[in-house]
Regions:
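Function-dense linear segments that define catalytic or interfacial modules
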Residues: 360, 445-468, 482-490, 647-732
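Conserved catalytic core of nucleic-acid polymerases
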Residues: 523-526, 635-636, 642-643, 647-650, ...
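Short alpha-helix plus adjacent loop in nuclease-associated cores
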Residues: 76-90, 141, 146-175, 231-233, ...
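Conserved "right-hand" nucleotidyltransferase catalytic core of DNA-directed polymerases
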Residues: 237-380, 485-667, 686, 696, ...
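Conserved RNase H-like, two-metal-ion catalytic cores of nucleic-acid enzymes
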Residues: 6-9, 19-59, 75-76, 80-87, ...
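Extended two-metal-dependent nuclease catalytic cores across DNA- and RNA-processing enzymes
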Residues: 2-4, 26-29, 79-256
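C-terminal polymerase-core module
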Residues: 545-552, 556, 560-609, 779-827, ...
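Acidic, Mg2+-coordinating catalytic module of metal-dependent nucleases/exonucleases
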Residues: 184-219, 462-539, 743-748, 753-758, ...
Length: 914
């Protein structure tokens, strides 16, 4: 593309709206309850496109009505597609109103698809001397690519894009030029659009045939030369191939037009855009849009300024002294300093050996470089024996106030995850009141959010736009290093995040629970868990044999020796088309086949042996691939696996585990237990597991104050049997195991806000019976009904539910018009006070136990947290003392109307400890 020509972006509105709708969780709503997740995702992609390409003009094309143009050629065109989701359909008029406020032309014509409008605009723009960018997720648009027409292809989610040029199209299709893309689809077809193509010819074969013969016409002319089944299909479906090519060809004669000279972007009123965004409740993007017009007509966001940098290499005594002096100054002044370690290769760093510690203070940015070039200069007050980065961080952690977007990772600079590496500082030596994790703070303020990227943080808490970092699209020659920008932004965020937490009652949770937990998690991650690779290998081989046996049984029952059991599409075909299993009530996927998800198969398993075997095959295959084959390679130099604990993932406040995820090993299946036999304690030690008993039910008793519930726990009764007696009207002595099991399901279902449908599914009973059981439960425990009703009413009024400690969970679904979403919001509001409080309690217990382990000189280590359970690696001679201490801490975290009970067990392996 030429730099001298004007650039226009033409956006495929339907494609981006669909992609955004499925990429952004359905938890966003306008103040009036209308869903806005697709709009939010669309606008996010829109802004990223503007930032990356800075087009001179933007237009958006939409489908209008049925695709008459192609349906006239192929009546079944797109006929298999399910109706558009009502929540997505409702957002199209809203996005069009917003685009009108942005003064972005909307192009559509009755009976024409957006694809053809993009094609028409591509050719019109090219003729007008413009460079054209077609923003779409449809690969068939690659046929339009020329020297002056590129496709910005949206792929996974909203952030992964590819710029398709003639060269990249040729590379993708192995020698097929853009003009031959319709020929490719003529052979391959397109299942998403119901374009038939030639049966049995997939993308690789289609590319190979066209590359060999030069075009579809030549492939057809030489059809007799194509051997085997593929040749038979080709010769039998020549008409289908020609029709498919015609249908797949993008039209360039749609009845739309645009005055390219008179169209420009941005050219909107700040007031109109602010009002439109405010109406939809999407205020977080307001400043990003207003920044595009530099404040004309409204108060636009300023650009975040990156301070000048003082750079110091390890051997540069003068510069190093200046940085050290600034570190000493901020420590003495009690100021916050942001610290970010950059492992990326800086420009000029030989083979990427230079590591840089970026520090942001009130005076500016400072970069400490550390390489292999020699010892650091001596500076008073600092110990650089292990490098300048370690020396500066050690002093900051011990004496200063440190901010970071990933405090735990920063602690691992001095306390490496691999325990075979030298530890320079015990994380527990850090005063948690002097550390500030900006991402944890942002998470507490919006725990339902999945990402806390820097653009979002700057926009939300500083009302500023971030300059592009070095290496990003559109970055200038003087763009800051990514880590430099991160450090500067982190320091700037401390004050506004602290202010917002104070206003929203989140400071106590941040200061009293989350920050004290950070050093504890760092220490646990370093401790790791000992795993036996030989045991893993043996288990994997044994399971592989079992999987092969199950596969043979499945294929025998199916009468098909070739189908891929792991393919949902092929499995669906075998079960429902070939074997004729019932499909009543089943939904089809977007690709047109019946779902084979776990829920569907579980319902069918009761009556069909093959389905039971498939579920068994899936469980065994998952255990083998996820754990038995993966854990061994994850061992570090100390022979241990070291999971990462995440504080900002779950909306409830619970910790999650990753790389590897040790919390998700199945606890109730024999296979899950088998995996745990590979984890052992060190020589002379055992596993100690201490688990809260029924903590969420005990919290329900405390929070509801129901006298019968409180009495049952205080008197130490079998709570589930007591519930069964009250609900089913029989003496406790006559409660059968089945009645107790049903009562247990109701007890835990109530905690999670379960309604009649959910209970009927879990107990395999009718809706009427489930509804009657729930009604009788509330009659038995009337205080619970009153409490839950009040929780939901309060959440609808405030927009959030909260824990005993003030941890809030915002629940926008409570305002949704969709009854299913609204029901989810109500169940979430009911559950959060119990589940969220349980998460708070276990976190407080972890911090207290960790301190006492240090203070009382235990050799034992806390090595794992799984929901309501803490696990320890404990020398045999400490088991009794440690058990007493841990139970004492866990049972006295908080005073409730009912006792908290912690139960302990031990074993040589993790499996034995339960």
């Amino acid at each position: 593309m030429s730099d001298k020509r004007r650039t226009f972006a033409v956006i495929d509105g339907n494609s981006l709206m669909h992609r955004a709708f499925h990429a952004v969780p359905p938890t966003m709503n306008a103040p009036d309850g209308r869903p806005t997740n697709a709009i939010f995702g669309f606008l996010n992609m829109f802004l990223k496109m503007i930032d990356a390409f800075n087009p001179d003009g933007v237009v958006v094309a939409f489908d209008k009505g049925k695709p008459r143009v192609r349906m006239e050629m192929l009546p079944q065109y797109k006929a298999q597609r399910p109706p558009m989701d009502p929540d997505l359909h409702a957002q199209f008029p809203m996005i069009k109103e917003l685009l009108a406020a942005l003064n972005v032309p909307i192009l559509q014509s009755e009976g024409w698809e957006g694809d053809d409008i993009l094609g028409t605009m591509a050719r019109l723009g090219e003729q007008a001397g413009c460079d054209m960018l077609l923003v779409t997720g449809d690969r068939d648009m690659y046929q339009l690519v020329t020297e002056h027409v590129n496709v910005v292809s949206t792929r996974k989610g909203l952030s992964d894009v590819a710029i398709m040029t003639p060269e990249s199209v040729d590379d993708l299709y192995h020698g097929i030029t853009p003009a031959l893309v319709p020929d490719f689809y003529g052979l391959k077809g397109d299942t998403s659009d119901n374009i038939p193509g030639v049966p049995g010819i997939g993308p690789k074969k289609a590319s190979a045939l066209i590359a060999q013969y030069g075009s579809l016409d030549e492939v057809i002319a030489h059809a007799d030369e194509v051997k085997g089944k593929m040749g038979e299909n080709l010769r039998a479906h020549i008409d289908d191939a020609l029709l498919s090519r015609k249908v797949a060809t993008i039209r360039t004669d749609a009845p739309v037009e645009l005055d390219f000279e008179a169209t420009s972007f941005p050219a909107f009123s700040a007031d109109e855009v602010s009002a439109a965004l405010g109406t939809l409740g999407i205020t977080a993007m307001q400043n990003r849009f207003l920044a595009l017009i530099g404040g004309e007509g409204g108060a636009a966001a300023s650009t975040f300024e990156i301070p000048a940098v003082l750079r110091a290499a390890a051997g540069d005594a003068g510069a190093l002294g200046a940085v050290a002096a600034e570190v000493s100054r901020v420590i003495d002044a009690g100021e916050w300093v942001a610290a970010v370690v950059d492992d990326d290769k800086e420009e000029g760093a030989l083979f990427g050996l230079t590591r840089t510690l970026w520090l942001a203070t009130s005076k500016g940015l400072f970069a400490l470089e550390e390489g292999d070039s020699g010892a650091a200069a001596e500076v008073e007050g600092f110990n650089f024996a292990h490098g300048v980065i370690a020396g500066v961080l050690a002093r900051l952690f011990m004496e200063g106030r440190v901010a970071s977007p990933d405090m735990k990772a920063l602690l691992h600079e001095l306390s490496p995850i691999d325990s075979s590496e030298l530890e320079l500082m015990d994380p527990l030596a850090v005063d948690s009141t002097r550390i500030f994790d900006t991402v944890v703070a942002a998470y507490l303020l919006d725990s339902d959010r999945s990402e806390f990227d820097e653009v979002y943080l700057a926009d939300t808490y500083l009302q500023m736009a971030l300059p592009a970092a070095r290496g990003a699209e559109g970055a200038g020659e003087d763009a800051p290093a990514p880590a430099a920008r991160t450090a500067a932004l982190t320091l700037a965020l401390v004050a506004p995040l602290r202010d917002r937490m104070a206003r929203e009652n989140a400071a106590n949770v941040f200061d009293g629970i989350e920050m004290p937990l950070v050093p504890v998690l760092a220490k646990m991650e370093r401790a790791g868990m000992l795993v036996d690779p030989d045991r893993l290998h043996s288990l994997s081989e044994g399971l592989a044999t079992q999987i092969a046996d199950v596969e043979r049984s499945i294929r025998d029952l199916a009468g098909d020796e070739t189908f891929n059991i792991g393919s949902p599409m092929q499995l669906s075909h075998v079960l429902f088309d070939v074997m004729g299993l019932p499909t009543k009530g089943l939904k089809k996927t977007k690709r047109g086949y019946y779902s084979t998800n776990a829920k569907v198969l579980s319902d069918l398993a009761r009556d069909h042996e093959i389905v039971r075997l498939i579920l068994d095959w899936r469980e065994k295959s998952k255990i083998k691939s996820t754990y038995l084959d993966t854990l061994g390679p994850l061992r570090r130099g100390d022979g241990r696996v070291h999971t990462t604990y995440n504080q900002t993932i779950t909306a409830t406040g619970r910790l999650s585990s990753s790389d590897p995820n040790l919390q998700n090993i199945p606890t109730r299946s024999e296979l899950g237990r088998t995996v745990k036999t590979a984890f052992s304690a060190g020589e002379g030690s055992v596993f100690l597991a201490v688990d809260y008993s029924q903590i969420e039910l005990r919290l329900l008793a405390h929070l509801s104050g129901d006298e019968h519930l409180v009495r049952a726990f205080n008197e130490g009764e079998d709570f589930h049997a007591e519930t069964a007696a009250r609900v089913f009207g029989v003496p406790v002595s006559e409660v059968t195991p089945d009645l107790r099991s049903r009562a247990k399901a109701v007890n835990f279902g109530i905690v999670y806000g379960q309604q009649a449908y959910g209970l009927s599914q879990s107990l395999h009973i009718s809706m009427a019976e489930a509804r009657d059981m729930i009604d009788r439960y509330y009659e038995a425990y009337p205080g619970v009904r009153t409490f839950l009703d009040n929780v939901v009413a309060r959440a609808k009024q405030t927009g959030y539910a909260e824990t005993m400690y003030g941890r809030r969970r915002h629940i926008p679904e409570l305002k949704a018009k969709n009854p299913q979403l609204r029901g989810f919001g109500e169940r979430t509001a009911m559950n959060h006070p119990m589940q969220g409080t349980a998460a708070d309690i276990i976190k407080i217990a972890m911090a207290r136990v960790s301190r006492r382990l240090e203070e009382e000189g235990f050799a034992a280590h806390m090595i794992l947290q799984v929901h309501d359970e803490l696990d320890f690696e404990c020398p045999v001679d400490e088991v009794e003392r440690l058990t007493t201490m841990v139970r004492d801490v866990m049972e006295h975290v908080v005073d409730l109307r009912v006792p908290l009970i912690a139960e302990a067990s031990t074993g040589i392996t993790w499996a034995d400890a339960k």
